[in-house]
């Protein structure tokens, strides 16, 4: 029986391994945890979420919602698990982290054609079909081998993880429930600040003691996961137009709008833990307690998880990969996940499905396929394989990646609806083409 190595038991690796297994292909899935830990993983589970517990919007006419619909057409394992681990989060699809990772692990272990190898991979096997899905925390040894294979220096920047707080330590007399603009159910907890409270918080934040490491001014951060203190340094109102924007959040029983608002999102099914939305940070733990407790409602906050920084590694995909995710220099190697330069949980998982599809087709001697550029997945693959290699930066799913409608549609809501309808038709065609 033919075999594929899948290196990395994260979101992309699990999707790739599962797809291959469903096609009757033997898989060796390599995961270095718990033999070798990372700076942010807490368990040995497959598919562990280490940043937010939100998989972003599930609204059908959004880019993130469309991405999920496309993945469901392709038989996504992770979205099936996510539905079973879902927690209230308004229009977003958020999950209980532990339950989600447990379900993913169970599904993989239940596949008889998948052999789970709990070992670190230092070198990509020579002469064997492999999918590299080692993620943002690729080990130094494997990163060195990838540099040898690709002839390129990997690019590094630093993602930041937001703190999580015990629900019973929150002062609910100062906090109100609501979702922005009333979309979905009122699943978010909102901590309103007046101008004086915000300015005090802001001054403390920009003068916070930051963990030692790479210069905060020289580090590269992807905007979707930028540390709050870095956002704050861009200007006094940067947070108020970012994660602390008050628009669409009316204080119950008051005609006055808050000057700024911190949102908290439920992270577990029991509702005992809430995460600070958009407040990834690299502050020292003591500083996190001191500064975040300045926010009304968080004065006695018990932090069950502090914000931390971790490295993200990704390759120069425009130089190295075809849209099929096959390596140009080594055709027996495919890449998937954040290491390809996609950003986001579902984006990473989607590339795992595509890598699995094309690894299977390569084994079978069939032509490699990618979804049409009018699909979100196809547009992402086109972006990472055809962008300028001189200043390549990670990208997440958004409608701006899609080709314009012909003729143009001026009304945004109608345009987005047209994008979705066109994409779903194209993804349906792609799914049918896989039968050949």
Swiss-Prot record:
InterPro entries: FAD/NAD-bd_sf (IPR036188), MnmG-rel (IPR002218), MnmG-rel_CS (IPR020595), MnmG_N (IPR040131), TrmFO (IPR004417). Its cofactor is FAD. One of its GO terms (biological process) is tRNA wobble uridine modification. It is found in: Cytoplasm. Its main location: cytoplasm. PANTHER family: GLUCOSE INHIBITED DIVISION PROTEIN A, METHYLENETETRAHYDROFOLATE--TRNA-(URACIL-5-)-METHYLTRANSFERASE TRMFO. Belongs to the MnmG family. TrmFO subfamily. This is Methylenetetrahydrofolate--tRNA-(uracil-5-)-methyltransferase TrmFO. It comes from Syntrophomonas wolfei subsp. wolfei (strain DSM 2245B / Goettingen). The lineage of its organism: Bacteria, Bacillati, Bacillota, Clostridia, Eubacteriales.
């Amino acid at each position: 029986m033919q075999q594929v190595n899948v290196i990395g038991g994260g979101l992309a690796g699990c999707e790739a391994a599962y797809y291959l297994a469903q096609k009757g292909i033997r898989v060796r899935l390599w995961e270095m945890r718990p033999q070798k830990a990372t700076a942010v993983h807490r368990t040995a589970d497959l598919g562990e979420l280490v940043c937010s517990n939100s998989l972003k919007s599930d609204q059908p006419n959004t880019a993130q919602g469309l991405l999920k619909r496309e993945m469901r057409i392709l038989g996504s394992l992770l979205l099936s698990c996510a539905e079973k681990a879902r927690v209230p989060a308004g229009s977003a699809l958020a999950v209980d982290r532990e339950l989600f990772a447990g379900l993913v692990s169970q599904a993989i272990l239940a596949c008889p054609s998948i052999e789970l190898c709990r070992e670190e991979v230092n070198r990509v096997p020579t002469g064997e079909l492999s999918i590299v899905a080692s993620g943002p925390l690729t080990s130094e040894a494997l990163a060195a081998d990838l540099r040898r294979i690709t002839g390129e220096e990997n690019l590094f920047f630093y993602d930041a993880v937001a703190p999580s707080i015990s629900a019973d330590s929150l002062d609910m007399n100062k906090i109100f429930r609501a979702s922005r603009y009333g979309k979905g159910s009122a699943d978010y907890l909102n901590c309103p600040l007046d101008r004086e409270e915000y300015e005090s918080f802001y001054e403390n934040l920009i003068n916070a003691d930051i963990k030692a490491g790479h210069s905060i001014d020289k580090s590269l951060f992807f905007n979707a996961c930028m540390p709050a203190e870095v956002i704050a340094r861009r200007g006094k109102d940067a947070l108020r137009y970012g994660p602390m924007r008050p628009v669409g959040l009316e204080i119950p029983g008051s005609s006055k709008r808050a000057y700024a608002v911190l949102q908290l999102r439920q992270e577990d099914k029991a509702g005992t833990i809430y995460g600070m939305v958009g407040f990834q940070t690299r502050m020292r733990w003591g500083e996190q307690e001191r500064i975040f407790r300045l926010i009304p409602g968080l004065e006695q906050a018990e932090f069950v998880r502090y914000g931390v920084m971790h490295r993200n590694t990704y390759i120069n995909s425009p130089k190295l990969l075809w849209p099929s995710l096959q390596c140009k220099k080594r055709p027996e190697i495919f890449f998937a996940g954040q290491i390809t330069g996609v950003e986001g949980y579902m984006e990473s998982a989607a590339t795992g499905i595509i890598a699995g599809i094309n690894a299977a087709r390569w084994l079978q001697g069939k032509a490699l396929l990618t979804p049409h550029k009018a699909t979100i997945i196809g547009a992402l693959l086109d972006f990472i394989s055809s962008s300028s290699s001189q200043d390549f930066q990670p990208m997440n799913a958004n409608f701006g990646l899609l080709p314009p409608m012909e003729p143009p549609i001026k009304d945004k809501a109608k345009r987005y609806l047209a994008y979705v309808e066109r994409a779903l038709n194209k993804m349906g065609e792609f799914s049918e083409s896989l039968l050949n």
